């Protein structure tokens, strides 16, 4: 973490620029393996399943069998394990910034858009996997 660029978590601070959450030094990714559903809101395609390989406040790395277009907007729904069951979180919107093929699958880097709320499950996933 840089000394001259401290973490700014709240948008009501004077130094908040809008992209602070997405800067890699402010939002390190945490390795995880979490099931998700992905909806690209295409009328021809149903939502599909994937896995998140790492996550941070700024975005995540998504592993899926479906090809996603770069710059596409996705609605990602995380599933948190509670005992034996999985709990569905509120979907969050993200923009695909990079896609590459890995065998017959695809790995996409996604930047989250908008405010992150507790209902999205992101903070809980970070807390569970950073121990």
Describe each model-derived feature in a short phrase:
Residues 1-55, 127-131:
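N-terminal helix initiation/capping motif
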Residues 30, 44, 70-72, 88, ...:
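Residue-level preference for beta-strand/loop junctions
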Residues 30-36, 68-81:
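Short coil-to-beta transition motif at edge beta-strands of beta-rich domains
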Residues 41-43, 57-58, 99-104:
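Short, conserved beta-turn/loop elements at beta-strand boundaries and strand-helix junctions
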Residues 48-52, 90-99:
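Short beta-strand-centered aromatic/proline hotspots
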Residues 61-64, 102-113:
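Short, solvent-exposed secondary-structure boundary/capping segments
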Residues 81-91:
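Short, Lys/Arg- and Gly-enriched loop/turn segments at beta-strand edges
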Residues 117-126:
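A short macromolecule-binding patch
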